[in-house]
């Protein structure tokens, strides 16, 4: 008998190694949440490429912000995301890198 297929939530958590992609914490599974990297209210979809594992704290801090805005001023979380969120769409990763570059580039 084959085991039951994983739910989307279980699949995303497993892909992200049951860790928050933002802070790298590994809380108990009941404290993990799914986060829309690009919020649905801002055009993000329900695809696996737009979903990541987040702890409750990071999900609440990010709220309805797109990941590039949330991560632009937080080098540690940004680095964690780029290392841990291998399943997100490449365009999202590019947007995060571009936003970070704009913050550190001197004016002029």
For each of these PLM feature ranges, what is it?
Residues 20, 42-61:
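Short beta-strand-alpha-helix junction that forms the catalytic/metal-binding core
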Residues 33-37:
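Histidine-centered catalytic micro-motifs used for acid/base chemistry in nuclease
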Residues 72-78:
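Catalytic-site neighborhood detector that most strongly recognizes the C-terminal catalytic loop/helix
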Residues 106-108:
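Short intrinsically disordered terminal tails
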